[in-house]
Amino acid sequence: MTAPKRTPLFDAHIAAGAKMVDFAGWEMPIHYGSQLKEHEIVRSDAGMFDVSHMTVIDITGADAKAWLQKLIANDVAKLGFEGKALYSGMLTPEGTVVDDLIVYLTAYGYRMVVNAGTTEKDLAWMESQKAGFDVALKVRRDLAMLAVQGPKAIQKVCSIKPELAEAIRALKVFQGLPQGEWFYARTGYTGEDGLEIMVPADQAISFFHQLQAAGVSPIGLGARDTLRLEAGMNLYGHDMDETVSPLEAGMGWTIAWEPAERKFNGREALEAQKAAGVKMKQVGLVLEGRGVLREGLKVVVESVGEGVITSGTFSPTLKHSIAIARVPAATGAAAQVDLRGTLTDVRVVKMPFVRNGKKVFE
């Protein structure tokens, strides 16, 4: 067993009272005392997450654009100015999901952020796709990344970066602001406003302390999961993986079908799937009574078929259980979940469940 890796913020987590756990081979904070309280802080104020375990890859070379247009399902040609970002799946030729990621246009090429647990697989896959392209990849382990999220996140970051306040406030969602080795992006994984900020690793702890002094609470991975689930956001390895099509995982919106001549990996398989009719779809499930919907539980849709819960939890905001599920495409507004041998009625809803701290489904 190799020892788990540590982010540049490890000592700051310990000092803040974090309970550390192994997550994708990294020692990460699961909470700092109360997962529930941390969840509520992000919904009502501002919290910060260490996401330095995720992998930042800088992409350069004359063919970087053409290579990315083959590698991912969304189209980097949409990125019209430096700092603009898009979300995409990286697909196999069979049209299943290798990983989900964000790509930013930069002055030198592109910057990609991929998941921690898939990094080695992703890099091997990307290297295998480079033949015939003038493209180079550089993994930026010299950077740390902090996500500052919540209704007061922008205000509190601006209070410690007053010289950038105007530029930060001007950022729209999925836009980034490069500042030397620092990079501020108006992105997140919580369903709240906020920033994901890349900083040189040796400046990460001092920035963490500045944020603490500005009233930004550290938040663990436990609350990160309940927040993203309320926001209806996928988690790789749970809601989609290399056995699942993006069309069956709520990722259809991330596929750029035009221009028709762009031959991205998996395109033919997805077109065939669309032509034949997609068999499964992703939905939200709501259980307003007792019980908790958990990953792996069977979903039964009368006279239609069966599906499965891919992520489930008790929602701290809604005070009842919610889940993301993959169910037969013909599923309507009602289904049942097998809770300890009892088929229990659940509502089928369109996600997200929560946006900006408020319930948004019907």
Swiss-Prot record:
Its EC number is 2.1.2.10. It holds the Pfam family GCV_T. It catalyses: N(6)-[(R)-S(8)-aminomethyldihydrolipoyl]-L-lysyl-[protein] + (6S)-5,6,7,8-tetrahydrofolate = N(6)-[(R)-dihydrolipoyl]-L-lysyl-[protein] + (6R)-5,10-methylene-5,6,7,8-tetrahydrofolate + NH4(+). One of its GO terms (cellular component) is cytosol. One of its GO terms (molecular function) is transaminase activity. It comes from the Bacteria. InterPro entries: GCS_T, GCS_T_bac, GCST_C, GCV_T_N, GcvT/YgfZ/DmdA, GcvT/YgfZ_C, TrmE/GcvT_dom1. One of its GO terms (biological process) is glycine decarboxylation via glycine cleavage system. Keywords: Aminotransferase, Transferase. The glycine cleavage system catalyzes the degradation of glycine. Belongs to the GcvT family. The glycine cleavage system is composed of four proteins: P, T, L and H. This is Aminomethyltransferase.
